[in-house]
C-alpha cells in the first residue's frame, strides 16, 4: 500500500504543487477575492447548519474516537470497512431533514482522524469505494442532492491521521498502533493531504468550503498552511476555509469556529478567548454527547435547548453548526429527527429574527440577546420573569416595539438611560419572547 501511495502521490504532487507554488508568497498577505467576501456574507446570513460525523467507526457504535480510545492496532482497524455497508443511506432524506430543520448548510466528515476517506479517492485505497462492500461515493450523492435542494455543502477534513504512516512525527494523541517509527511529513502534507483536498475541490462541483480539524494534535508543527490554503483558494476562490485549531485566526482563513462554545466564552477550556471582528463566526456542538454514533448515548438535547442555543449563537454574531451521528446503515436516529423538525417549526415563526441578522447592539446577558437586521433590532428574552426589562442605551430612536409573533404592540420607554420594555407574560412552552424594535432610519 505504501509503494502504491507514493506512486500516486507523486502524480498528485506535480498537479498540486503547480497550483500552490504560484500563490504561497501572496497567501501570507491574503486578500480575499470578491467571490470569497460574498461567500462570507452569505455564510453569516445562513446562521444554522447541520454537522454530520459518519464513517466506518460508526460500525462499532462507540463514537468517532473509537480507534484511539480502544487503542486498536492498524491491522485490526483495517477490518472495520468490511462491515460498513450503509444500504439505508439516502441523500435525499438527509438533505430534506436539514431543510425541514431550517438548516441552510451541511458540513460532513469527508474523513475523520482515522484517515478513512468517505469518498472515491485515487490518492489511497483507504476509502469507502475500494474498502467497503458499499462500493459507492455518498459524498457525490450528497453534493448532487444539496444542489437540488439549495443547501450549501462543506467538507470536514481531518488534518490529523491515526492511520497513515507518513503522519510523522506523531502528535499528542499517538499510541503504539503498529505504524513504523518513521515517516515523510512533507509527503503527507503536500502529496497525500493536498491531493485529497484537490479531489474534493474538483470532483464535487462548487462547495461551500473546507472545515479543518486536528491541527491541535501538533500545534507547533509546520502544517504548510500557506500552501494548502492557496491551493483551496486557487481551485475554488469562493470556498471558505474554516479551521478548528482553537487558535487566533491566520492569514488565509475565512471563518473562526468555536467547538462546544460560544465565541470568546471558552467554557470548554480549549478554545481561544480571542474573537475576530473581521471574520464570520461559528459555534459547533452536537445533539447528544458524542459526535459519531454511540449506541449508549441517549443524552439528547431537547428542541427547546437547541432553539435557545441557536438564539444565543445569533446574538453572539455567530452561526450554529449542530451535529448528528447517523447509524452505520445510513439511517438517522429518530430522536434527532423529531428534535430537528421541531426546531424547523419554531424557525418558521421566528426565523426573521435569526436568518440574515448580525449580533445586536446590546451585549448578550443571562436574560437573553439581541440580533439586528436593517432598521430592526430583535430583543430575544430567554430568561427573564419580571414584567419590565431595562436595556442599556441604543444608538438611534426607537419608533415602535411589537411582538414578532402575533404583532401585538409592546409598551416601551426610551430615555438617556436606555430602553424599558413592558413584557407580556410568556406563553406555555415559549422559550424565546421576541420583541421587534423598529429604529428611526438615519436622516429621518
Predicted regions and their residues:
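Bacterial N-terminal signal peptides
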Residues: 10-20
Amino acid at each position: 500500500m505504501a509503494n502504491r501511495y507514493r506512486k500516486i502521490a507523486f502524480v498528485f504532487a506535480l498537479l498540486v504543487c503547480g497550483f500552490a507554488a504560484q500563490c504561497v508568497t501572496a497567501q501570507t498577505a491574503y486578500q480575499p477575492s470578491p467571490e470569497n467576501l460574498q461567500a462570507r456574507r452569505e455564510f453569516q446570513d445562513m446562521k444554522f447548519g447541520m454537522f454530520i460525523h459518519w464513517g466506518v467507526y460508526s460500525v462499532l457504535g462507540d463514537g468517532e474516537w473509537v480507534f484511539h480510545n480502544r487503542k486498536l492496532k492498524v491491522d485490526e482497524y483495517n477490518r472495520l470497512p468490511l462491515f460498513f455497508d450503509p444500504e439505508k443511506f439516502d441523500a435525499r432524506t438527509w438533505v430534506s431533514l436539514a431543510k425541514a430543520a431550517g438548516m441552510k448548510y451541511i458540513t460532513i466528515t469527508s474523513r475523520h482522524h482515522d484517515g478513512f476517506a468517505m469518498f472515491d479517492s485515487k490518492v489511497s485505497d483507504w476509502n469507502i469505494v475500494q474498502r467497503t462492500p458499499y462500493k459507492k461515493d455518498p459524498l457525490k450523492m450528497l453534493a448532487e442532492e444539496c444542489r437540488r435542494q439549495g443547501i450549501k455543502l462543506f467538507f470536514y477534513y481531518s488534518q490529523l491521521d491515526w492511520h497513515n504512516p507518513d503522519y510523522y512525527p506523531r502528535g499528542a494523541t499517538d499510541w503504539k498502533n503498529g505504524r513504523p517509527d518513521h515517516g515523510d511529513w512533507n509527503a503527507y502534507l503536500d502529496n497525500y493531504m493536498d491531493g485529497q483536498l484537490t479531489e474534493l475541490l474538483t470532483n464535487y462541483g462548487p462547495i461551500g468550503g473546507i472545515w479543518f480539524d486536528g491541527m491541535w494534535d501538533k500545534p507547533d508543527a509546520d502544517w504548510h498552511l500557506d500552501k494548502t490554503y492557496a491551493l483551496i483558494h486557487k481551485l475554488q476562490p469562493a470556498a471558505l476555509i474554516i479551521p478548528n485549531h482553537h487558535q487566533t485566526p491566520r492569514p488565509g482563513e475565512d471563518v473562526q469556529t468555536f467547538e462546544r462554545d460560544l465565541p470568546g466564552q471558552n467554557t470548554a477550556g480549549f478554545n481561544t478567548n480571542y474573537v475576530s471582528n473581521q471574520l464570520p463566526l461559528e459555534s459547533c456542538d452536537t445533539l447528544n454527547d458524542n459526535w459519531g454514533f454511540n449506541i449508549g448515548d441517549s443524552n439528547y438535547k431537547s428542541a427547546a435547548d437547541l432553539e435557545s442555543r441557536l438564539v444565543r449563537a445569533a446574538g453572539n454574531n455567530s452561526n450554529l453548526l449542530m451535529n448528528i451521528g447517523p447509524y452505520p446503515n445510513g439511517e438517522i436516529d429518530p430522536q434527532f429527527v423529531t428534535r430537528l423538525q421541531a426546531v424547523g417549526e419554531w424557525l418558521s415563526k421566528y426565523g426573521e429574527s435569526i436568518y440574515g441578522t448580525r449580533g445586536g447592539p446590546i451585549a448578550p446577558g443571562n436574560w437573553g440577546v439581541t440580533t439586528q437586521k436593517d432598521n430592526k433590532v430583535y430583543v430575544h428574552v430567554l430568561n427573564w420573569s419580571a414584567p419590565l426589562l431595562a436595556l442599556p442605551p441604543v444608538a438611534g430612536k426607537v419608533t415602535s416595539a411589537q411582538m414578532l409573533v402575533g404583532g401585538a404592540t409592546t409598551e416601551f420607554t426610551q430615555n438617556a438611560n436606555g430602553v424599558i420594555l413592558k413584557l407580556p407574560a410568556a406563553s406555555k412552552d415559549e422559550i424565546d419572547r421576541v420583541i421587534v424594535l423598529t429604529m428611526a432610519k438615519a436622516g429621518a
